[in-house]
Design a protein with these regions (language model features):
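Non-membrane alpha-helical structural segments and their capping/turn regions in soluble enzymes
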Residues: 77-82, 167-174, 178, 203-206, ...
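Active-site beta->alpha N-cap acidic-glycine motif
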Residues: 1-58, 90-93, 98, 175, ...
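Metal-dependent polysaccharide deacetylase catalytic core of the NodB/CE4 family, i.e.
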Residues: 27-115, 119, 123, 131-159, ...
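A conserved mid-domain beta-alpha-beta active-site/ligand-binding segment of alpha/beta enzyme cores
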Residues: 145-180, 185
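Hydrophobic alpha-helical membrane-insertion segments
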Residues: 20-21, 74, 152, 205
C-alpha cells in the first residue's frame, strides 16, 4: 500500500478561520493556520484576537505568516527579517510553545528569504505553488496540491489529457480536488489543500469545501498531518 498524507493550511488569521476550524474538527482533518497578527489587508475586527488564536491552537497547528503581511521580496532585507522574526516571537510568547512553520505572504520568496526563515528557527516554509502531490525537496519552499479557489489558469494544463465532459467537471476546484485526491490514493503522495476562510466565504464555497472534506476524511491507510509534521 502506497503512503498517502493529507495536510491542509489556511492563511491570514481571519475571524472566519473559526468556522473553517469547526469544519475540520467535524471531519477530523488536521490543519495549520498561518497567522499574521497585524495583517494590513484587514481591519482589526476581522482578525483573530490573541485569545482566539490560543483557542485555535488547542486543536490545530499555528504557523507564522509575518506580522503585517507584506510581500517580502518588495521590502528591504532588514524589514523582511524583522517581520519573520517578530512573527515567530509574538506567536511563541502568545502560545507558550514553539512555532516551527512559516508561510510566505502571497507565496513570494527568494533564496535570501528562505535563508532568513531558516535562521529565524523555523523548520519549514510553505509556498503557494500548486499542482504537486509531494512534499518537495526543499523544506523552505514546500509546495501545495490545490487552492480552495477557482484558478482558471490551472485549466489549460488539462486540455490535452481530458475529454470535454471531464473538462466541464474540473472547472470546479472542488471537483478537481476530489479527482486529484483519488489519484493520490492510487499513486501515493501528499495531498495538500490550502486556502483562505474569507475567500471561501466571499465565493460562497462553504458547501463545496465541506463536500471535499467529507470525501477525504477518515480514510484507511491515509495519514492526516499538520504542515509542521511534513518535515
Amino acid at each position: 500500500m502506497k503512503s498517502v498524507i493529507v495536510t491542509t493550511s489556511w492563511d491570514d488569521g481571519h475571524v472566519l478561520d473559526e468556522r473553517l476550524a469547526a469544519l475540520l474538527s467535524t471531519y477530523e482533518i488536521s490543519g495549520t493556520f498561518y497567522i499574521a497578527p497585524h495583517n494590513r489587508e484587514f481591519g482589526k475586527q476581522s482578525l483573530l484576537s490573541g485569545e482566539r488564536v490560543r483557542a485555535l491552537s488547542r486543536r490545530f497547528e499555528i504557523g507564522a505568516h509575518t506580522m503585517t503581511h507584506p510581500r517580502l521580496p518588495r521590502v528591504r532585507d532588514e524589514e523582511a527579517r524583522k517581520e519573520i522574526i517578530d512573527s515567530k516571537n509574538y506567536l511563541e510568547t502568545l502560545l507558550d510553545k514553539p512555532v516551527v512553520s512559516f508561510c510566505y505572504p502571497g507565496g513570494a520568496h527568494t533564496e535570501a528569504l528562505k535563508q532568513m526563515v531558516h535562521e529565524a528557527g523555523f523548520r519549514m516554509a510553505r509556498t503557494v505553488e500548486r499542482g504537486r502531490m509531494d512534499r518537495g525537496v526543499d523544506n523552505f519552499a514546500v509546495p501545495t496540491t490545490i487552492h480552495a479557489y477557482q484558478h482558471w489558469s490551472d485549466i489549460p494544463q488539462h486540455f490535452r489529457s481530458f475529454d470535454s465532459s471531464t473538462m466541464k467537471r474540473i472547472f470546479n476546484w472542488d471537483v478537481a480536488a476530489r479527482e486529484v485526491f483519488d489519484r493520490c490514493l492510487t499513486e501515493g503522495g501528499v495531498f495538500h489543500l490550502w486556502g483562505h476562510s474569507w475567500e471561501i466565504d466571499e465565493n460562497q464555497d462553504w458547501g463545496r469545501l465541506e463536500m471535499l472534506l467529507a470525501h477525504i476524511a477518515r480514510r484507511e491507510n491515509v495519514t492526516y498531518r499538520t504542515n509542521g509534521e511534513l518535515v
